[in-house]
Amino acid sequence: MAVVRGGSYDSTSHGANTPGLVTPEQINHLISNLNLLDQIGNFEHYNMNRIRLVWSRMWSVLSDFFVSVGLSENLSVAIFVMDSLRQLAMKFLEREELANYNFQNEFLRPFVIVMQKSNSTEIRELIVRCISQMVLSRVNNVKSGWKSVFMVFTAAAADERKNIVLLAFETMEKIVREYFPYITETETTTFTDCVRCLITFTNSRFNSDVSLNAIAFLRFCAVKLAEGGLVCYEMTGDNVSSNTPDAPLSTPVPTDKDDYASYWVPLLAGLSKLTSDPRSPIRKSSLEVLFNILKDHGHLFSRQFWVGVINTIVFPIFSSLHDKKEMDEDENDEYSEGTTWDSDTCTVAADCLVDLFISFFNVIRSQLPGVVSILTGYIRSPIQGPASTGVAALMRLAGDLGNRLTEDEWREIFLALKQAATLTVPGFMKVLRTMDDVNVLGIAQSYYDVDVASDQGLSADGLDDDDLQMASYIVSRMKSHIAMQLLIIQVITDLYKSHTQPFSEANISIILDIFSSVATHSQKLNSNTVLHKKLQKACSILEISDPPLVHFENESYRSYLNFLQNMLADSPSLTNATLVESELVVVCEQILHIYLKCTGAPSEKKEPNQPVLHWILPLGSAKKEEVAARTSLVVSALEVIRGFERDLFKRCVQRLFPLLVDLVRSEHSSGEVQLVLSSILQSCIGPIIMQ
């Protein structure tokens, strides 16, 4: 083949653009003669000085040839043609690329295609070495060629050979550390390609150090972006963006030359995706780096961009946590695994979210409902660790924001807590109903029969392995459910105590609904005596502790009682004080009913199928223990009644007096009840009788 050294456009079109040049038959012929391959290299070399468009037309044909030969099964020929291409590329990169052209990218494209398609380890390693040599020796002239460089390294990052991955990352490390300004001086997509390449390295299964270093380089990229002034604004209004994250921001409008989203979004989105990586160190590192980037450079973001980041980058991180809560709760095995995150990752994520929201509250306060929903999702977790994390995070969020929250924002918090308390109940009750099909010998289905047999021993007969497994799961679920419900009312109590200003009556109403629903739910659980006996027998056989049902009922009513009492004391100007007082009377009345039922005192309302009792039997040991456990609560209720104002006591004495009389006739485990009861009769009932 003749070497073309000059001539017009037409003189090249006949030789270089002839379709037959790259037919399979001619390629096979060229492969058999390395001299012809060398001649093609010379042909391209001597035509580099032609008009760029002319050269581009020639190269569109020759590049296909290099790809075809580079993918040849003949390793020697493939190596030869890749080395020839390297020499041509080194020569080509000596020339400065014209503005707004992408000739370099076109020239290097054969490396990309062969790297992606070649089955030869030797060829892929050679390409990585060739690209590394070219970019490090000609970095000043690389412009559009960066795209091909990063595409080659991206393919190398996903390679099945460890040495290729490490070799490519070594060059990437040098590029990012020493030549970062060259990456962003041409076009936005170049930086995006660099970020995607680093993210691919984070997924490397060969070396965790490579993954962690790649994540660190992503943070380095963010620092360089911020330092380089790539984000600037034309502000609207009088306010100017402050360097302090918490300063109020007017809405910045990006200028035409400031396409900042195309720089930040791929970087942030890549880190967000890494938070679901199966490797714990990678998850934690990506979480910390992502939120550190947002905290350190968030002051550069407009309000509109922040909203997009929160909804598309931050919130999806926690989707696995929510998905786990929303799964069907009768799937026993699902709950044994917990969330896809371990406890440490859950804690890191919650802390980072709260820190970020507090730092930029004035900018992203509209996203409060989403943040609260995530934290209450933690609280709803059937696992103790995430639930405790959610409580701590929500308390810190409310504590640090303090009086900056509006009543509507407090309403969002309380509604989310109410939802967390109520939405889990139907699924939990569905789980409990599975015990209805478990028949246990020695346990009757009648309330009265169960009650009088409470002190009889329970044998292991009547429960097979499947029944025991089911009971074990239900006990575990019940313990987690009780802990979650108590956590919610504890959070509300702590929020109320820490809030210096009175809540609105609308928010007080929501709080009362939560206390009422939890207390009612606890009483309903405690009233199912047959279920208790089944679980008690199973726990005895399995040698595990019983679910703390009495404790649940005591604490829920105690918290409800204390909240009502504190609210009346702290808010004397409350317009609906009468309604709160009425609710307080109802709660006290309910506590007395529960205690009297436990002591076996006769009541006007009898259980179905319960025979008439002509005398009261002494309490058995089990009932005595329960009465002792309930004593402190009933004493608290009696002390509240004793503290009623005279007018309030007169209004409710008709409802309370029969209960007080029943208390006189009941058997108690402590003298405290009689002592407070005597005080009520003397200081409250006596004056009314003496009138």
Language-model segment annotations:
Residues M1-Q691:
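Intrinsic disorder/low-complexity flexible regions in very large eukaryotic scaffold/regulatory proteins
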